């Protein structure tokens, strides 16, 4: 029964967190590049 509603939670979670981590790491990389 767990597998029936697990993708409906897991997919939006990855869809929101993964781009957020990507944008955050890119922002930190740009900021460090400007400082150096």
Curated annotation (Swiss-Prot):
Parts of the chain that traverse the membrane: 10-30
SUPFAM superfamilies: Subunit VIII of photosystem I reaction centre, PsaI
Keyword presence, Secreted: no
Keyword entries, A-Z: Chloroplast, Membrane, Photosynthesis, Photosystem I, Plastid, Thylakoid, Transmembrane, Transmembrane helix
Highest rank taxon of the organism: Eukaryota
Keyword Plastid: yes
One BP annotation, GO: photosynthesis
Function comment: May help in the organization of the PsaL subunit.
Protein's name according to its UniProt entry: Photosystem I reaction center subunit VIII
Gene: psaI
């Amino acid at each position: 029964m767990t597998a029936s509603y697990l993708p409906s939670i897991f997919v939006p979670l990855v869809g929101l967190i993964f781009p957020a981590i990507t944008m955050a790491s890119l922002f930190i990389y740009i900021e460090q590049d400007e400082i150096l």
